[in-house]
Amino acid sequence: MVSMFWLLATFAYLLGSLSFAILLSRLSGRPDPRASGSGNAGATNMLRLAGKKLAILTLLGDLCKGLLPILIASAWNLNIAQQGWIGVCAVLGHLFPVYFRFRGGKGVATAAGVLLGLYPPAAALAIAAWLLTLYLTRTSSLAALIATPLTLPLLAWQEPHALLPMSVLTLLIVWRHRGNLRDLLAGRERHF
């Protein structure tokens, strides 16, 4: 199973490296999301740049690239910790895509897909917290910064073996939002 773990970890990274925001913007003749809007290759920036349809497709694609490797790992009976590390690899692919000069997105939708595969109640909690925070603040980055860490106590209680990889995943997402944190603290963060 160790070799299957490494095979799936590599697959997850390579799948995570497929940036739906970049691919869909190229296919539709829209500007590269890394060079326009917020500069992020993700669904929120695609909503700003290309509208709802491409944003939804980006969101679903990014979510699926986190979910699919977990489902495959589960089908191969890899343990929950291994599945969690495979999910981290998918998010790393999204953050640092080999196909796009290691300039990717922030990993929120991909992380949601990972959580959906690992422990659906944690994904439901994260999505509900994200939607509520977005509704109340109109700030996508703040929603991500609240929703992702909020899942950790639930995972510690219900899936403790997934806690370490999901803590690493949370730290990656918070780190990737460090510019947004500065803007939030300075009152400059973009709102919808």
Swiss-Prot record:
Cystine bridges: none
Keyword Endoplasmic reticulum tagged: no
Main location: membrane
Protein location: Cell inner membrane
Reaction catalysed by this enzyme: an acyl phosphate + sn-glycerol 3-phosphate = a 1-acyl-sn-glycero-3-phosphate + phosphate
The enzyme's E.C. designation: 2.3.1.275
GO BP field: phospholipid biosynthetic process
InterPro entries assigned: G3P_acylTferase_PlsY
Pathway(s) where this gene product acts: Lipid metabolism; phospholipid metabolism
Domain of life: Bacteria
Record family assignment: Belongs to the PlsY family.
Subunit structure: Probably interacts with PlsX.
Protein name: Glycerol-3-phosphate acyltransferase
Higher taxonomy: Bacteria, Pseudomonadati, Pseudomonadota, Gammaproteobacteria, Pseudomonadales
